[in-house]
């Protein structure tokens, strides 16, 4: 059982971990710079109560499911948020956004488009499915999503920015079309 858990954990971390972009991608770095937030939260990280450490010291969500980020809570998006990937079974995952300055989950309209669940598959025409890898920076409200289809190895990408609506709700606004990966943003 432990071997399966370690294998699954390794796969999830490899596929869904948020990693910094290659610094040679100057155009994308410039785009992140265009969408800088006013301030990055540097205070005490407040982990929402819905996360608990198990006997092995790994974070699990309120359903007891493994949380696939690097098992450390840190700001990785738009100044005070962390995007967290949750396991819901084999090749099944969904994401939540946590406000680490307040220790609470935040509903962001459009975030579920990056999920891969039974009721909302990322690739409806794919037998094997795929995954969406998200690229973010702590000091920017820009989010780049790359979608990889396991059946075809086709990679597509698109860009979004986090917007706060007049009613106070948050929404991801798409600012590009879905294009082949490594296409510079226009």
Where are the model-predicted features located?
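Acidic, small-residue rich beta-repeat scaffolds with periodic aromatic anchors
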Residues: 4, 17-52, 129-186
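Sec-dependent N-terminal signal peptides
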Residues: 4-13
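Extracellular/luminal recognition modules and glycoprotein regions
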Residues: 53-71, 76-77
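Signature of short aromatic-glycine-proline-rich micro-motifs recurring in repeat-based ectodomains
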Residues: 62-63, 67-69, 124-135
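Mid-length scaffold segments of soluble, non-membrane domains
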Residues: 73-111
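Short consensus segments that form the blades of beta-propeller domains
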Residues: 85-89, 123, 150-153
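Surface-exposed loop and turn segments in beta-propeller and other repeat-based domains
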Residues: 110-124, 182-183
């Amino acid at each position: 059982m432990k071997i399966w858990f370690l294998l699954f954990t390794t796969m999830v971390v490899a596929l869904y971990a948020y990693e910094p972009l290659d610094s040679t991608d100057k155009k994308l770095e410039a785009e992140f710079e265009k969408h800088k937030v006013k301030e990055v939260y540097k205070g005490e990280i407040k982990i929402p109560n819905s996360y608990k450490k198990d006997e092995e010291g790994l974070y699990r969500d309120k359903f007891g499911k493994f949380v696939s980020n690097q098992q450390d809570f840190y700001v990785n998006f738009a100044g005070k948020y962390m995007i967290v990937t949750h396991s819901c079974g084999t090749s099944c995952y969904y994401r939540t956004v946590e406000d680490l300055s307040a220790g609470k989950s935040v509903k962001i309209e459009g975030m579920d488009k990056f999920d891969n669940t039974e009721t909302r598959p990322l690739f409806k025409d794919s037998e094997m499915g795929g995954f969406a890898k998200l690229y973010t920076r702590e000091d920017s409200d820009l989010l780049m999503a790359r979608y990889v289809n396991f059946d075809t190895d086709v990679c597509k990408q698109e860009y979004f920015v986090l917007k706060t609506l007049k009613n106070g709700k948050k929404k991801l606004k798409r600012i590009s079309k879905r294009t082949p990966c490594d296409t510079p943003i226009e």
